[in-house]
Amino acid sequence: MRDELFTEELKKQFEFDERVAGVFDDMLSRSIPYYALALELSADFALANLPKEGGWVYDLGCSTGSLLLEIERRAGAKNPRLIGIDNSEAMLSRARAKALGYGSRVDFIQGDILDFEYQKSEVILCHYTLQFIRPIHRAYLVQKLYDSLKPEGILIFSEKVVSEDRVLDHQMIERYYAYKREQGYSEVEIVKKREALENVLIPYTAKENEKMLLEAGFAHVETLFRWVNFATFIAKKGEA
């Protein structure tokens, strides 16, 4: 279904409810530059860091489940345990419907990623999710994810990022709005979504994200991909 959510007046704070879930796949593809490529890279590196057989993969803020279903499709004999976690039942109902259609064994669980008890895993994925976690809790979550990874495990996540330079940041935002116009969003929709996400989506700079990861204990942090103010990072835990 096409995303026309912000052509109407929203009567409450933005949340991932039934209305958003119904258009979410279209919203992602038209609102996040190279979103499909970020997922493809995530699947590539997730599979490369799994053992020959088995292993655990979590996707936090899994929304409609597309990434885990793609990893499962490509995993073959590796046959990892794939678990998606989201706090939105509306999103998960769509993920489960997709899984049923594909005959998938991916587990989709409703829960709070801050409180969830994770099994030791090789891979944790977290795309455009940390930016919705309040800064006061964000470092705690990253530390918890680090502690949940096995030695040499990886965390792959994507975030909207801000520039340390005010002028450059403004230019980057304007280029992003131009992208949204190219995708068919109107000026009214762009303004309404910006207002809806204010104080809900709180991005860090790339350096702030890297600092948070290193302070949690990750041995290596790399930028896998970046387009203007959207970035995909990979962080690797050291050996035991």
UniProtKB/Swiss-Prot annotation:
GO terms for biological process: tRNA wobble uridine modification. It holds the Pfam family Methyltransf_25. GO terms for molecular function: carboxyl- or carbamoyltransferase activity; S-adenosyl-L-methionine binding. InterPro entries: CmoA, Methyltransf_25, SAM-dependent_MTases_sf. It comes from the Bacteria. Gene3D superfamilies: Vaccinia Virus protein VP39 (3.40.50.150). Keywords: S-adenosyl-L-methionine, Transferase. It catalyses: prephenate + S-adenosyl-L-methionine = carboxy-S-adenosyl-L-methionine + 3-phenylpyruvate + H2O. S-adenosyl-L-methionine binds at residues 35, 61-63, 86-87, 112-113, 194. Its EC number is 2.1.3.-. HAMAP family: Cx_SAM_synthase. Catalyzes the conversion of S-adenosyl-L-methionine (SAM) to carboxy-S-adenosyl-L-methionine (Cx-SAM). Homodimer. Belongs to the class I-like SAM-binding methyltransferase superfamily. Cx-SAM synthase family. This is Carboxy-S-adenosyl-L-methionine synthase. It comes from Wolinella succinogenes (strain ATCC 29543 / DSM 1740 / CCUG 13145 / JCM 31913 / LMG 7466 / NCTC 11488 / FDC 602W) (Vibrio succinogenes). The lineage of its organism: Bacteria, Pseudomonadati, Campylobacterota, Epsilonproteobacteria, Campylobacterales.
